[in-house]
Design a protein with these regions (language model features):
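ATP/adenylate-binding site constellation spanning eukaryotic-like Ser/Thr protein kinases
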Residues: 3, 19, 122
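C-terminal cap/substrate-recognition subdomain and adjoining C-terminal extension
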Residues: 77-191
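Hydrophobic "anchor" residues
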Residues: 12-14
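Single conserved hydrophobic/aromatic residue that forms the stacking wall/gate
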Residues: 1-4, 8
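A metal-dependent, Asp-based hydrolase signature
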Residues: 16-19, 23, 27-92
Length: 191
């Protein structure tokens, strides 16, 4: 058994919902995305007010992922450009609490996580996973699924500190010794 700090990373480090921010990157460059914007706004609203179940989240993202995402020809280059622009938004408090054994468990997609985790030197992380050919979720790291996925991948881990921006992570809070709720640069210990 080993203890660690766990982060619901990208939303708390950057503020906002990373997949939505990435999709908005295309609003400026690709008019085909505009037909998905109303649905993406609804997703943002529902996520902000914790109005999703896992099944509803999968369904909500499906039309965007299956209708638009799989047709992006420059995805890898676009991810690099996205992080070139957004890496500086990582909140400075993270460097103060960072540990070498940190694990990131995030609802963000693996294709977005891979690049930023490599840049900042985080080796242990897991996120949602999307089949790039079909646009379907292979794994959705959201709500109670986070605990299930975490326990499958790190069966001997004990969570000392858990940092999150959302009460949606109640299931992760329940298995953590200490919980910190993050709002921008403000961190409040709630457990």
């Amino acid at each position: 058994i080993y203890t660690l700090s766990l982060h619901d990373a990208l939303p708390i480090w950057l503020g906002g919902e990373t997949l939505i921010d990435f999709a908005l990157h295309y609003v400026k460059t690709d008019p085909k995305i505009w037909k998905y914007v109303p649905k993406l706004l609804v997703i943002c609203f529902k996520d902000a007010f914790h109005l999703f179940t896992v099944e509803e989240a999968i369904e909500a993202y499906a039309s965007f992922l299956e209708g638009y995402f799989i047709h992006i020809k420059t995805l890898d280059e676009d991810v690099v450009k996205f992080w070139d622009k957004n890496e500086k938004k990582i909140k400075p408090w993270y460097n103060e609490v960072r540990r070498d054994d940190d694990i990131v468990v995030s609802g963000s997609t693996d294709f977005l996580l891979d690049e930023i985790m490599k840049r900042i030197g985080i080796k242990n992380y897991v996120g949602s996973s999307i089949d790039k050919k079909t646009g379907k979720f292979k794994r959705l790291c959201f709500l109670e699924n986070k605990v299930k996925i975490f326990n499958e991948l790190y069966p001997n881990a004990h969570i000392d500190n858990f940092y999150t921006d959302s009460m949606n992570d109640k299931a992760m809070m329940d298995i953590s010794d200490h919980v910190f709720l993050v709002n921008g640069n403000k961190i409040e210990q709630i457990k």
